[in-house]
A protein has these predicted regions:
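Non-catalytic alpha-helical scaffolds and adjoining flexible linkers that form interface surfaces
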Residues: 1-20, 25-191
């Protein structure tokens, strides 16, 4: 089995001496994991930074077998915001939430496209409002639309807490998951 797609790098872990296991969120295939041989080498390391948008080639001997990735970088996302801690932590929070709550190998084009759009919103002045709306869209898209009652009078901190409670109630607690650390840090920036 073989496919090509674009996606964002959600996580990476060392595997063997020079390889890594990456988890990606792709446009046409959803969340996928696989091995990258030589992924921790000096030549390849720069491609595989969490948050990078990459073009992926995935191959496997079977549909349910562990696959192997090769990749080329499309855009280095997080380094663009190293000078702004709030934006960098916000991007990492979004990536961590996607990693935690999205099901493996389930196509979510609307969520992918909304995340891709969110990344471009970090260049605007009201980026935190766009992030809050993105979290609400994510919760709605995953089937909890009836539980989302938006109060437009909330300030940023209250809106982040509101969204956090929705995530906890609908995803984290029922599945015995922890709220991503970066999401908790983001909330603390607005105390």
């Amino acid at each position: 089995m073989y496919w090509q797609d674009e996606g964002y790098l959600l996580s990476k872990n060392n595997f063997d001496e020079n390889s890594i296991i990456i988890e990606t969120f792709t446009l046409n295939h959803g969340k996928y994991s696989g091995i990258v041989y030589g992924g921790s080498s000096k030549k390849q390391k720069k491609k595989f930074q969490i948050g990078n948008k990459i073009f992926l080639n995935w191959s496997s001997k079977g549909e349910n077998k562990t696959g192997y990735f090769t990749a080329e970088i499309i855009k280095a996302v997080v380094p663009s915001f190293f000078d702004d801690k709030k934006k960098a932590i916000c991007i990492l929070a979004a990536l961590s939430i996607l990693k935690t709550i999205l099901p493996e190998r389930e196509i979510n084009k609307k969520i992918y496209l909304s995340f891709d759009k969110l990344i471009n919103q970090f260049y605007s002045e009201n980026w935190i409002n766009k992030y809050i709306l993105w979290e609400i869209l994510l919760i709605k898209e995953l089937g909890f639309e009836d539980k989302v009652k938006i109060n437009n009078k909330l300030d940023i901190k209250e809106a982040l807490i509101f969204n956090k409670n929705l995530l906890l109630e609908n995803f984290m607690i029922p599945n015995n998951l922890q709220m991503p650390f970066s999401r908790n840090i983001l909330e603390k920036y607005y105390n």
